[in-house]
C-alpha cells in the first residue's frame, strides 16, 4: 500500500475499519446473536453478514469483548463445540489486506505507537448445502487461555444454485470478441422463476470484453480466478439512455451519465431508487473486473507495473485530466471525445461522460467478495440508496486512475467493509 501522507484521525479510523470490520446500524440484514446472552468478557455481536453464505461456506464477523481483563491475541471459532481454528491463521488465506497489516506492524511501526488493528473475521469452508450450523467465538489470551463462549449464532447455507456458464450463450474469452449481448442474455436467464433453488452466472476461462451489463434481483455473478471481465473501449457500448443521474436535484439538474460496466439500475433512472427496488445480489469470485479506462505506465514508455513491499505487482495508470485525456485515456478518451463531438464542452464531457466500474442503486442486500477491481474510466464501486451491503476481501487497484475512488456509499445504510486491500488515490 502506498504511504504518501500521515492519516488524519478520521482517515485512520477508516483505514482500521476497512482492514478489519466496519459495522452498520440495526436492522442490518445479518444473522446475529443476542448481545444480552454473551458475557462481557466474550466476543460480542457475532454475525453472518447478509448473503455471505453460499452453498459451501459462510463468513463470521464479531466485535471485541466489552471487558478485557487480559490481553486478547486471537480468536478461536467453534462449530457445534468443535474447534475450527484461529482467526489470524484463517485471515492468511482469506484477507488480501492482512499481509500488509502484518508488515506494517512488524517492520514499519515496530515501536508500538500505533493502535494495533484487531482482525475479527473468519471464513468457514467445507460446509454442506442447505444446512443449518451453529457457531460460537472465544477470545484467546496471551497465556493461551480462552474467554467464555460468545452467544450462539445460527446460519444456514444456501441451496446449490443452477449455474449458467457464460459460454452457453456464445461468450468468448479471447480478449477481443465483444460479449455484451451474450453476457446480458446469460444474466437475463438467471432468474428464480427459471431456477427456484437460485441461480449463478459464471464467467470463467479467459478475458471477456463487454460493454455495460445490467444485473437484476436474486442472482449471483461470479468471475472465476482464471477470468477477467474487460470493459469495451467503445462508447456505444455504454448508451447514455441506459445511464443514470447521480442526484435527483430539480433546482440544479445534473447531467445524465453513461452506465457503468456493471449496473443495477432502473430503466428510467431519475437519480434515486429506494433500497428494495432490487434485492439479493451477489458479485463474487477470485477473478478481475477491468474497466479499461486508462493506459498503463506513469508516463509514456514507463513501467506498466511496480512491485510493492510484499512482492506483489501493482498496476500503474496514467494520472491525467481533461486536457490530457486524449493522450492518456482508453475508454476515458473515447467517451470524452464522443461527447465533445456532440457539442459538449470539453470539461463537462470529461466530468460527466466517463463510465465507472459499478453503479449499484436501490439494492436491499448486496454482497461483493474476492474480486480484483481495477482501471475504471471514472469511479470504482458506487453503492447508492442501498441497504445491507457487505464488501469482503476485494482488491482495489485504481491508484492514479483519475477520480477512481475505491468505494462510494451514497445515501446507503448498514455497510460492512472488511479484509479489503486498497491501492487508490
List the model feature ranges, each with a label.
Residues 2-12:
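Bacterial N-terminal signal peptides that target proteins for export
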Amino acid at each position: 500500500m502506498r504511504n504518501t501522507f500521515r492519516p488524519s484521525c478520521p482517515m485512520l479510523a477508516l483505514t482500521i475499519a476497512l482492514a478489519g470490520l466496519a459495522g452498520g446500524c440495526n436492522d442490518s440484514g445479518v444473522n446475529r446473536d443476542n448481545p444480552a446472552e454473551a458475557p462481557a468478557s466474550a466476543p460480542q455481536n457475532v454475525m453472518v453478514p447478509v448473503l455471505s453464505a453460499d452453498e459451501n461456506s459462510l463468513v463470521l464477523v464479531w466485535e471485541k469483548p466489552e471487558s478485557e481483563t487480559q490481553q486478547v491475541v486471537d480468536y478461536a471459532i467453534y462449530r457445534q463445540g468443535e474447534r475450527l481454528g484461529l482467526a489470524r491463521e484463517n485471515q492468511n488465506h482469506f484477507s488480501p489486506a492482512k499481509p500488509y497489516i502484518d508488515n506494517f506492524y512488524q517492520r514499519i511501526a515496530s515501536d508500538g505507537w500505533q493502535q494495533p488493528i484487531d482482525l475479527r473475521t473468519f471464513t468457514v469452508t467445507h460446509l454442506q448445502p442447505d444446512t443449518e450450523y451453529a457457531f460460537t467465538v472465544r477470545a484467546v489470551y496471551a497465556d493461551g487461555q480462552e474467554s467464555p463462549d460468545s452467544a450462539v449464532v445460527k446460519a444456514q447455507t444456501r441451496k446449490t444454485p443452477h449455474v449458467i456458464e457464460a459460454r452457453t450463450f456464445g461468450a468468448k474469452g479471447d480478449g477481443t470478441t465483444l460479449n455484451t449481448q451474450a453476457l446480458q442474455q446469460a444474466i437475463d436467464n438467471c432468474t428464480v422463476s427459471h431456477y427456484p433453488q437460485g441461480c449463478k452466472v459464471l464467467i470463467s476461462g479467459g478475458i471477456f470484453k463487454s460493454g455495460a451489463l445490467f444485473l437484476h434481483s436474486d442472482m449471483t455473478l461470479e468471475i472465476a480466478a482464471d477470468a477477467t471481465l474487460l470493459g469495451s473501449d467503445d462508447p456505444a457500448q455504454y448508451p447514455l439512455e441506459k445511464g443514470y443521474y447521480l442526484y435527483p436535484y430539480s433546482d440544479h439538474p445534473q447531467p445524465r451519465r453513461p452506465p457503468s460496466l456493471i449496473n443495477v439500475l432502473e430503466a428510467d433512472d431519475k437519480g434515486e431508487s429506494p433500497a428494495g427496488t432490487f434485492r439479493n445480489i451477489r458479485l463474487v469470485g477470485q477473478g478481475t473486473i477491468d474497466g479499461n479506462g486508462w493506459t498503463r505506465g506513469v508516463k509514456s514508455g514507463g513501467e506498466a507495473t511496480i512491485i510493492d513491499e510484499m512482492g506483489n505487482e501493482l498496476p500503474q495508470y496514467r494520472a491525467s485530466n481533461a486536457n490530457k485525456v486524449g493522450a492518456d485515456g482508453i475508454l476515458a478518451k473515447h467517451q470524452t471525445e464522443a461527447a465533445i463531438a456532440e457539442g459538449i464542452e470539453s470539461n463537462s464531457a470529461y466530468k460527466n461522460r466517463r463510465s465507472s466500474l459499478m453503479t449499484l442503486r436501490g439494492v436491499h442486500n448486496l454482497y461483493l467478495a474476492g474480486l480484483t477491481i481495477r482501471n475504471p474510466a471514472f469511479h470504482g464501486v458506487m453503492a447508492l440508496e442501498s441497504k445491507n451491503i457487505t464488501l469482503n476481501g476485494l482488491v482495489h487497484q485504481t491508484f492514479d486512475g483519475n477520480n477512481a475512488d475505491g468505494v462510494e456509499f451514497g445515501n446507503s445504510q448498514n455497510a460492512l467493509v472488511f479484509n479489503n486491500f486498497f491501492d487508490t488515490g
